Every structure is written in structure tokens, then in C-alpha cells.
């Protein structure tokens, strides 16, 4: 995983990438966590564990998508997360490039995809930990269906998302399209992605990915 900032030419390169290449890059990112040595792990049970689906949870209807605007901050009240958001591209290996480890409390937004609040599935990534401490998405797997994620945008609006699914997916049987594709056409959706499972010292990577799916249900100022 590269700690370098993506170059100014990355945006032009990313616009030419196919959706399949993006999915592969996201999968590669999860496999390349080699600098984290602590065994700070998120829960995982099975190949694709649904950890955020309380029974009989009634979710609100989807709101109309907003126009395009850049994300500036993400708030997850139930986790106590208030983090700046920075645009990211792909690294030299073609994997999505998260913020560097010295900015482990920052969330990266994939700038080649949808913008949070606009139609499509916007992708955000963050570290689960560093060598020495938990990072911004350390508690991500504890989110539950019905809880709220807010993205503050540069147009002054707050895109309010409701969590509808939390998955811990084994890397051995990873369904990239299910994880990152839009679940319902026409909706504004959000994916929050980090490492999960346990840290395998031999391979230098985590055994799973935590993927939170949410959709736009309101706006604020």
C-alpha cells in the first residue's frame, strides 16, 4: 500500500478505467495491508457475515439524490467519528489508495466514482488501525441497520444516509460487485470500507473486509 499522495494525473487515468478494473483495485487494496502488525481485529463469522441486520428494523424511504458536490467531512454519531474526507485515486499497483498511515484519522473518498449524495454508489475507505493505535474505522463493524452516517459537502448541504447493511466478507470468497455495485438503481448510496477479520502475520494482511452499505434518506444544512 502506498503512502504517497495520488498525482494530479490520477483523475484523468481513473476516468478511463472500467468498472471491473475499479472493483479489482478495491479488492487489491484490502489485500495489501502489510504495514499493520497489531492484531486488532473486527468480528467475522463465515464467508459473508451479516453483522448489522437487527430483526424487524423498519428503514425510512430513500430521498431524492442531490447534485454533485465534494465531500468535506464524515460524521458517524453512533461511533463517535468526525473525520475529514480527502479525495483519493489509485496507487502504482492499481489499488485504491487510502490516506497514508500518518493520517489514519482521515477518510478517503474514491474521486473517480460517485459523489456522496448524488446518484450512484459513493465509495469511502479508511484504516482500521496502525502499528500503534486504532484508526478512524476501527469500530466500523459495530454499526447497525438504521443508524446514521452524515457527509458534509462543499455546497453547504449535509447528506444524511441510513445504514441498511453491514457485511464482513472473507477475502477467499469476495463478491466485489455485490460489495461495491449500486444496490438499487436511481438511489444515492454510500459504501464505507475497511479491513476486518483477523490479522494474518504470515501473509501480512487481514482476512476479511468490513463493508457498510447506506442510502440517502435526508438532507440538512
Q: Where are these predicted regions, by residue range?
A:
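Hydrophobic H-region at the start of alpha-helical membrane spans
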Residues: 11-22
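Solvent-exposed, non-transmembrane regions of membrane-associated and secreted proteins
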Residues: 23-144, 150-221
Amino acid at each position: 500500500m502506498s503512502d504517497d499522495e495520488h498525482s494530479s494525473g490520477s483523475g484523468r487515468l481513473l476516468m478511463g478505467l472500467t468498472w471491473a478494473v475499479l472493483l479489482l483495485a478495491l479488492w487489491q487494496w484490502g489485500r495489501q495491508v502489510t504495514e499493520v502488525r497489531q492484531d486488532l481485529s473486527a468480528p467475522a463469522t463465515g464467508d459473508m457475515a451479516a453483522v448489522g441486520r437487527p430483526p424487524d428494523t423498519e428503514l425510512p424511504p430513500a430521498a431524492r439524490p442531490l447534485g454533485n458536490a465534494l465531500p468535506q467531512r464524515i460524521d458517524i454519531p453512533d461511533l463517535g467519528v468526525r473525520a475529514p474526507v480527502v479525495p483519493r485515486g489509485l496507487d502504482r499497483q492499481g489499488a485504491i489508495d487510502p490516506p497514508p498511515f500518518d493520517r489514519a484519522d482521515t477518510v478517503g473518498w474514491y474521486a473517480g466514482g460517485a459523489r456522496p449524495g448524488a446518484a450512484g454508489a459513493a465509495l469511502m475507505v479508511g484504516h482500521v488501525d496502525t502499528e500503534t493505535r486504532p484508526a478512524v474505522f476501527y469500530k466500523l463493524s459495530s454499526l447497525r441497520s438504521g443508524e446514521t452516517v452524515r457527509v458534509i459537502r462543499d455546497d453547504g448541504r449535509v447528506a444524511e444516509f441510513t445504514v441498511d447493511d453491514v457485511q464482513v466478507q472473507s477475502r477467499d470468497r469476495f463478491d466485489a460487485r455485490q460489495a461495491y455495485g449500486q444496490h438499487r438503481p436511481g438511489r444515492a448510496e454510500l459504501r464505507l470500507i475497511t479491513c476486518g477479520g483477523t490479522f494474518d502475520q504470515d501473509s501480512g494482511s487481514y482476512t476479511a473486509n468490513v463493508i457498510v452499505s447506506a442510502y440517502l434518506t435526508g438532507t440538512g444544512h
